[in-house]
Each structure stands twice: as structure tokens, then as C-alpha cells.
């Protein structure tokens, strides 16, 4: 039936999803025709969602095995590796971050596309519901006018025209025309029940879509936050941040696989509908609407006759006949019975109102309006909606794989940071080769003896207040330094390089420099230095 449509063609991805294997819980093949009320068909969709659950279980199992092996092999690696190689962890973190960012971009696009498709669906349903409401309103108003208003006027006129048999005969003929109109309007399908069903479907769909969109939005934001926290944790080498990332990453991994299963099942079910939507609608309306009416609105072809054309024609002819009769009574009967003018004018206004309702009803019953809403709903669901679901499934798959890799890299990074901290804690403070010890020896803030040296020669005259480096040096080292400077008087007063020992003696220039110090400088450097 779907192949005969000239104005709607299901996209190729719906056929691809429609051909997915449909298996029940007994691993038996199920018909892929869209039948959401059928238990076997429901099991086939749940089975597709369970595939993601199985993948999640395998992923968690592999992570458990990896973490166990990592913990068991930790001691051996610590003994063999003096300086752990962080290249693999760094590249894994970089690639994982890029994949997560790409997945989030795909997810935002898919979430927006799905939301646009569902919005177009609900908008079309509300428009169709408004059209059906207008049809019901026009039919109801016309029935009320014929059954109540016209009947009252005819009863009063029958009393007034009782002396004249020809006039009463005209009134009976008008009553027959009104009965014909009532019969045709009553034969029209009841649209109130359909209207209520469409309104409920649209409201429920909009409610579900809002929370679906919000859930995916929060999941996308959570993925970005975890990615940023991972970068921050690796940059600051913070173990507690890595622990938080492990917990949040595990939760996000579970949610990613769950969203993949739900998205796959929804996309396959929607594609089953999109491949043959007419067949499903015909089956659903069976017993409520005739097949002629359903086909008329589903296809809206010029070759299909309007099923309401005969009723509308009888309605129009009956109104025209009644208007002619009323016009004749106004022309001839009012002269004899002046009191009948009021009721005749009332009937004329009622017939004019019914004719206006007839024109509106004819326009509303035309297939083009409802068929347009039907096509827009199909395009919204089967094009934007299913396409967005595919992008969301791709996002979930990429995010699940990326977080699986992240959960493998984070424990390794945590161990490398722990090894680094342990190595720093194991440094011997008394070790003469300790870089920290050598730094403290040359750190002016930790010196106890302050030295002041005056440099003069071709370099210029400069008074310098330099605290000495506290360290002891042997005589050979000092002599080696003297040989280094080749007994140049220019470097006579330079403190020994590489040693914390002061010069063996102080020159008069140094004493002069010290005596020229201000009180503030003396308070700053203390009284440790004595000349």
C-alpha cells in the first residue's frame, strides 16, 4: 500500500531499520509489521533494547577484568619501571576527549532533529483535531437549527395558517425538507470521539517528548562536564578528581548503553510504522469509519469520489427548496396573515445561517486539509524524527566506547600519580645528592650567614648585599676555585661558586660596605654576620 503513494516516500533509513531482525524472547522471528498492541511485536522491540543491555554487561565485565589485572600487576610494574611512561595515558585521554566532544556535537544535532520532528507531528495532529472539531461544530449547529429552531417556527405557523390548507401543505413540505437535512447530517460520521482521541494522543506525545528532550540534554551536558573534569584532573594530577570521574564515568557509561537500547527500539518501531503507515491507520479505524472515508483522506486522489458529496448535495437542494417556499409565503401569505411575518423571517434567517454552515462544512470535509496535516505528520516523524534518533544512537554508541576507554585510562593515571607522590615521599633529606637539599643550601631565605661583597673593576662599581650560601667547603675546593680564577684580583672577593662557605678573609672594601649599611638593612639581615 505504501508503494502506491505518490506524495509520500519513506526514506531509505526507515527501510534499513525495518529490516532489522525482529525476534521474541524465544528467539523466534516475528512479523515486522507495526502492531504495537501485539505481545510478540512488543517482545521484538524489547529484545533489541536488551542487546544494548548485553553489551553493557560485557563492557562492565571487561572493565572488571582490566582493573583486576591492573591491581595485581601493580607491584611488579613498580619494581621494574623506575620512571613510568605516561605517553599512552596522555594519548588515550586526548583521543577520548575528542571522541566525547564529537559525540556530544552529534547528540545535540540528533536531539534537535528529533524534537523538530515530534513538534511537527504534534502540530499536525492539533491542526487535524481543529479541523475535526470544526466539522463537528458545523454539523451540530445545523442539526440544532433544523431540530429545534425550525420546528418551533413551523408549529406556530401551522396554527396561524390553519384556515388555509394550501399554506399548511407548504409547511408540511418544508418539514419534509428539514427531515431530509437531519437525516443526511445524522448519517455523517461522529467526529467527536476521533477528536478526543487525537487530542489525547497529541498531549501524551508532547509530554513524553519534553522529558525525552530534557533527559538527553542533561546527558549531553554531563558528558561535557566529565570531559572537562578529566582534563582538569590530568592537568592538576589530582587523584580525588580522578576518583570522581571514575564514579561519574561509570554512571554515564550505563546511561549511554541504556539510551542506545531505548533509541534503537524506538527507531525500529517508528520505521516499521513509516514503511506502511496507511495500512496501520486503516486497521485502527476499522469499525469506526468506513474504508471509503479513510482512503479518501489518506490518498486524496481526484479519482476517489467524495463520500460526503451526496449528503452535501441533498443538504443544499433541501435548503434551496425551503428558501423558495419561505420566499413565496412572505410574498403572498403575509398579506392575509400579518402575524406570520415574524416566524417566516425567523425561518429565513435560520436557513441563511444553515447555508453558511453548509459552505464551511463543505470546505472542512474536503480531503486536502486533513491530507496535508497527515503528510506533514509523516514527514516530521519519518524524516526528522527517525533521522534524529539515528544520530542519538550514534552519540550513545560513541559516548559508551569513549567512556569505556576513559575508565581504562583513569585508573592507570591514578596509579602513575600515586607512584610519583610515593617517590617524592621516599627522598632522603640527608642525601647530599638530594636536589631539594642542594636547593635549600642555595636558597637565600634559609641561609644563616649573610655576605656582602663589593665588585669593582672594569665591570663597574657596585655595592651588593648578597646573603652567603650556607655550606662547608674543603680547602682543595677553594684552592681549585682560586686556580679557576687564576688569582685575578677582579674575582678576589667573589663568594665560592658551588659552595656555601664564605671567603677565608674579608677585604677592607667588604668591611667598608658592612659599616656603611643602614639600620634598616641590619635589622633585615640580622646579626648573624659579624665582621
From Swiss-Prot:
Residues 66-87, 235-239, 411-531 are cytoplasmic. It comes from the Eukaryota. It is found in: Cell membrane. The chain crosses the membrane at residues 45-65, 88-108, 214-234, 240-260, 390-410. The keyword Repeat does not apply. One of its GO terms (cellular component) is plasma membrane. Coiled coil: none annotated. The keyword Membrane applies. Keywords: Calcium, Cell membrane, Chloride, Chloride channel, Glycoprotein, Ion channel, Ion transport, Membrane, Transmembrane, Transmembrane helix, Transport. GO terms for molecular function: intracellularly calcium-gated chloride channel activity; volume-sensitive chloride channel activity. Pfam families: Tweety. CDD domains: Tweety_N. Probable large-conductance Ca(2+)-activated chloride channel. PANTHER family: PROTEIN TWEETY HOMOLOG 2-LIKE, TWEETY-RELATED. Belongs to the tweety family. This is Protein tweety homolog 2-like. It comes from Danio rerio (Zebrafish).
